Curated annotation (Swiss-Prot):
Belongs to the Fmt family. This is Methionyl-tRNA formyltransferase. The lineage of its organism: Bacteria, Pseudomonadati, Pseudomonadota, Alphaproteobacteria, Rhodobacterales. It is an enzyme of class 2 (transferase). It catalyses: L-methionyl-tRNA(fMet) + (6R)-10-formyltetrahydrofolate = N-formyl-L-methionyl-tRNA(fMet) + (6S)-5,6,7,8-tetrahydrofolate + H(+). It comes from Ruegeria sp. (strain TM1040) (Silicibacter sp.).
């Protein structure tokens, strides 16, 4: 098929690779424009942009698709279908209607649960035991279109957003190839009206760890916000991110470090901190981290935070 690919971050790259490997003709690749990044704040192409150029594909990165000129350029590609995965721009109706089979979206949740920008983070943070991928026929609403294909997967008890992100990306890549191969035979199932939830964009302000809640909630926040933006707490004015954790046994005053394994008492239960990161430093496993930073048994993280 003649395909327009629309995606931007790392999550989208395996999908592009799968479409190329399956022999589809990529008419053009649409992605977000290069943005300033790094210490020098130089414009850096997005992961999809870089991969598309490496594959010798035409790359387009308009700031918007609302203008008639951009819409005409899109329609002129004469595509059979557009495949959209984490593109990041709203698609006007003229764009949705341009390909012969419309626009298919790969969404990382079991719709209608977790419509919106951060379905992987929100599923882990909410304690969901299962999630999945939906291939959806796009329409004007936010992730409201009928579902052509869905597949469910279990969320591991210690799985982070980073790990689940990678698994779902590969799952989506396999599923879109299957969907395009059987597109005329797929039945579009309208999403049920019951069970709708929204995965709002992650706000950095919600990443601070509250040790007074249950250990399960602390652990889910740590795993759900790893690697970005990273759940954090402060000690003596230094912000420390926690990128991996697991539930542990132990009781004590809320926020107290209970042992040399960085087990911290919560409102109920305790969590063991497995991987941490200081500002401006690389992430480190707990044992390596503790060689350069002291968090002794008996330290109360609430008191240490207030002491700054």
């Amino acid at each position: 098929m003649r395909v327009i690919f629309m995606g931007t971050p790392e999550f989208s790259v395996p999908v592009l690779d799968a479409l190329v490997e399956a022999g589809h003709e990529i008419a053009a690749v649409y992605c977000q424009p290069p943005r300033p990044a790094g210490r020098g704040k130089k414009d850096r192409p997005t992961p999809v942009h870089a991969r598309a150029e490496a594959l010798g594909l035409e790359v387009r990165h308009p700031v918007s698709l609302k203008g008639s000129e951009e819409q005409q350029a899109f329609a002129a590609l004469n595509a059979d279908v557009a495949v959209v995965v984490a593109y990041g721009l709203i698609l006007p109706q003229a764009v949705l209607d341009a390909p012969r089979a419309g626009c298919l979206n790969i969404h990382a949740s079991l719709l209608p649960r977790w419509r919106g920008a951060a379905p992987i983070h929100r599923a882990i943070m909410a304690g969901d035991t299962h999630t999945g991928i939906c291939i959806m026929q796009m329409e004007a609403g936010l992730d409201t279109g009928p579902v052509l294909l869905r597949k469910e997967t279990e969320i591991g008890g210690e799985e982070t957003t980073a790990a689940l992100h990678d698994r779902l990306s590969l799952m989506g890549a396999r599923m879109i190839v299957d969907a395009l191969a059987t597109l005329p035979d797929l039945k579009a199932e309208p999403q049920p009206e019951a069970g709708v939830t929204y995965a709002s964009k992650i706000d950095k302000a919600e990443a601070q760890i509250d040790w007074s809640v249950a250990a399960e909630e602390v652990d889910r926040k740590i795993r759900g916000l790893s690697p970005f933006p990273g759940a954090w707490f402060e000690v003596d004015g230094q912000r420390l991110k926690v990128l991996a954790s697991r539930l542990a046994e132990g009781t004590g005053a809320v926020g107290t470090v209970l042992d040399d394994k960085l087990t911290v008492a919560c409102g109920s239960g305790a969590v063991e901190l497995l991987r941490l990161q200081r500002a401006g430093k690389a992430a480190q496993d707990r044992e390596v981290f503790l060689r350069g930073f002291t968090l002794a048994k008996g330290t109360n993280l609430l008191t240490a935070q207030d002491a700054e």
